[in-house]
Amino acid sequence: MIRKLEEKDITTIVELEEKIFGETLGVEMLHSELSNPLVWFRVIENENQVIGYIGGYFYDGAGEIINFLIDDIYQRKGYGTLLFNSLIEESRAAGIKQITLEVKETNIKGINFYTKNEFKQISVRKHYYKDGENALVMMKEIKWKY
C-alpha cells in the first residue's frame, strides 16, 4: 500500500535512512517538511510495515526527488517501481514537466534504476556529499499520456 507520509512514520524512515544510506535527513527536517505544501512524501508498506519512501518537491512545473529508498530486504521485488511510478503519476497530474535528482556516483543500483526509468545524467556535483563523494545530477522529462 502506498500512502502519504505521516508523523508516526518518521522514526521508521530515519532508521531506514541510517540503515541504507548511513546518514539521514533527520527527524527535525522530516517533521518540518510534513507541513510544507511544496513537499511530496509517500511511503510504501508491506503487511502494515513501512519498507520505503520517496520524497521531493513540486514547484514551477518541475520536481526534485530528495530521497528515495526501499529497505534492502525488499529491493528488486517491485516495491521501488510501484512507489516510483506513483510519483510519476502524481507529477503528471500536477503538471510537472521534468524531475531531477542527485545520486551518489558509486550507487550503481540507484543509477541503473533511474536509467531504466528514463533519467539522463545532466551534470556532476563535485564533492557534494558529506563523505566527499560526487553526485550525478539526473533528469527525466515527464511525458503526457494521451
Features from the language model and the residues they span:
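Conserved catalytic-core motifs of GNAT/GCN5-like acyltransferases
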Residues: E102, T115, K120-L136
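Short aromatic/hydrophobic contact patches that present stacked aromatics
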Residues: L69, T100-E102, V137-M139
